[in-house]
Amino acid sequence: MAPGYHRIVVGADGSPHSRRAVVFVARLAPPRGGRVTCVRVIEPVRLPSMPFVPARMRAQLATQAAAVDRSRRAVAQRQLDAAVSALAKAGWRARGVVRAGLPLQELLAAIRAERADLLVLGARGAGAVRHFLLGSVADAALKRSPVGVLVVR
């Protein structure tokens, strides 16, 4: 591994490409003091403004949305636990973080928070929109990341 890459952020959205990104990093020889933070971003369920819907029904919808968020967070944590385990078995100090928000913004925030020097992403993620060669988050990260970006297919 290049001497400059000791703190890596991996976007781990559970997609096949992101799982390959985790495997790719796991196969690298960890440098002394090297660490990996796997980041899973959950986009919160946003309810539209519903002024004409009765308050009781709005409250029920909000409760259901919160339950969906909790369920998605639990699934994300299980996926992260698997990624962290694979990295730890390969000798990396690794941890997983679930963040809520927009994927690119949260990955960039994680880079800053972890003082990362490399971002590793799968070429395409779990999003509904498919790009021809590169997913929207990977494409935007290549343009906006303050650190090097490694895209794994």
Feature annotation, model-predicted:
Residues 37, 95, 150:
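Conserved beta-strand positions in the Rossmann-like core of class I SAM-dependent methyltransferases
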Residues 59-71:
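Short glycine/proline- and acidic residue-enriched helix-loop micro-motifs
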Residues 1-3, 17, 70, 74, ...:
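Structural beta-alpha unit
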Residues 2-62, 90:
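Small/aliphatic-rich secondary-structure junction motif
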Residues 5, 118-143:
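Glycine-rich, Arg-bearing micro-motifs that act as flexible, cationic patches
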Residues 40, 122-124, 153:
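Short secondary-structure boundary segments
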